[in-house]
UniProtKB/Swiss-Prot annotation:
Residues 21-112 form the Ig-like domain. PANTHER family: T CELL RECEPTOR ALPHA VARIABLE 1-2 (PTHR19343), T CELL RECEPTOR ALPHA VARIABLE 21 (PTHR19343:SF13). V region of the variable domain of T cell receptor (TR) alpha chain that participates in the antigen recognition. Alpha-beta T cell receptors are antigen specific receptors which are essential to the immune response and are present on the cell surface of T lymphocytes. Recognize peptide-major histocompatibility (MH) (pMH) complexes that are displayed by antigen presenting cells (APC), a prerequisite for efficient T cell adaptive immunity against pathogens. Alpha-beta TR is a heterodimer composed of an alpha and beta chain; disulfide-linked. The alpha-beta TR is associated with the transmembrane signaling CD3 coreceptor proteins to form the TR-CD3 (TcR or TCR). The assembly of alpha-beta TR heterodimers with CD3 occurs in the endoplasmic reticulum where a single alpha-beta TR heterodimer associates with one CD3D-CD3E heterodimer, one CD3G-CD3E heterodimer and one CD247 homodimer forming a stable octameric structure. CD3D-CD3E and CD3G-CD3E heterodimers preferentially associate with TR alpha and TR beta chains, respectively. It is found in: Cell membrane. This is T cell receptor alpha variable 21. It comes from Homo sapiens (Human). Keywords: Adaptive immunity, Cell membrane, Disulfide bond, Glycoprotein, Immunity, Immunoglobulin domain, Membrane, Receptor, Signal, T cell receptor.
Length: 112
């Protein structure tokens, strides 16, 4: 069983290393007045993805998942958050409606 687990970990590492996916977020930093809508963009180079996920990270804390969009979906909504996915253009956008002081955080997108 230990050998199987070791091979599985090695396979996962090789899959990660062999990926040619590049992910870019624009803007790198953003400041908006309270109550304004916030728009964050994420672009990726390979349209053959399984899903795209947006995360939030508060200072000194771990990542919190916000929205997960499967490759077959075009958007996902949760409360004031809405994320869209356009695989053909390699782009996702996270919209946060009516920004609040508590929205101050680092936002990240990840593709798989």
């Amino acid at each position: 069983m230990e050998t199987l687990l070791g091979l599985l970990i090695l396979w996962l590492q090789l899959q990660w290393v062999s990926s040619k996916q590049e992910v870019t977020q624009i803007p790198a930093a953003l400041s908006v007045p309270e109550g304004e809508n916030l728009v964050l963009n994420c672009s990726f180079t390979d349209s053959a993805i399984y899903n795209l996920q947006w995360f939030r990270q508060d200072p000194g804390k771990g990542l919190t998942s916000l929205l997960l969009i499967q490759s077959s979906q075009r958007e996902q909504t949760s409360g004031r958050l809405n994320a869209s996915l356009d695989k053909s253009s390699g782009r996702s956008t996270l919209y946060i409606a009516a920004s609040q002081p508590g929205d101050s955080a680092t936002y990240l997108c990840a593709v798989r």
